[in-house]
């Protein structure tokens, strides 16, 4: 089963929105997705397996920071390397676009996602109280710095090698 990471376009929206609705309590609307895809300084990629969209990642590029805004994987495809492949593609493309740091927020209860992000060198630096709606759960703020350097490049090569072995 091959996994392709491709740029998101409007033909992917129905599948992406279905995934969003399964994994997020307040999924993005079609209008918001369309607006995001049209905005500058955005990087949206989806994972396609056997012709079906199984995940999506979205990044906002601001100055030399890359802010991961969304990572969503179809529940049936979770724990199969999809999120890792999406994060790898996002990190590589953000670096190519000039990013020197990677940041995101993640639910404090989402320990699985936190472990994934730690693999990418993201470390907790703070909390945002009541960040997530509708339940008011706190967000853990995570950052990775110097992602344009040789140590981070080696980290990404290691992750890519693990993905190749798992495929």
Language-model features, listed with the residues they occupy:
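Extreme N-terminal starter segment of soluble prokaryotic enzymes
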Residues: 2-4
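Conserved beta-strand edge residues that scaffold enzyme active sites
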Residues: 30, 34, 108, 131-132
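Conserved catalytic core of the tyrosine transesterase superfamily
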Residues: 42, 101, 107, 133, ...
């Amino acid at each position: 089963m091959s996994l392709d990471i491709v740029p998101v376009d409007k033909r992917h929206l129905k599948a992406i929105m279905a995934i969003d609705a399964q994994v997020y309590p307040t999924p993005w609307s079609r209008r918001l997705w369309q607006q995001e895809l049209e905005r500058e300084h955005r990087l949206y990629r989806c994972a396609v397996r056997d012709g079906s969209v199984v995940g999506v990642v979205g990044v906002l590029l601001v100055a030399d920071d890359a802010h991961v805004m969304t990572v969503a994987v179809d529940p049936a495809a979770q724990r199969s390397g999809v999120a890792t492949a999406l994060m790898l593609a996002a990190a590589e493309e953000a670096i190519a676009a000039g990013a020197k740091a990677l940041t995101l927020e993640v639910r404090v209860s989402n320990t699985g996602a936190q472990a994934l992000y730690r693999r990418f060198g993201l470390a907790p630096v703070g909390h945002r109280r009541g960040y997530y709606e509708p339940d008011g759960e706190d967000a853990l703020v995570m950052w990775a710095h110097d992602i344009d350097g040789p140590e981070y490049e080696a980290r990404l090569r290691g992750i890519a090698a693990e993905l190749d072995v798992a495929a």
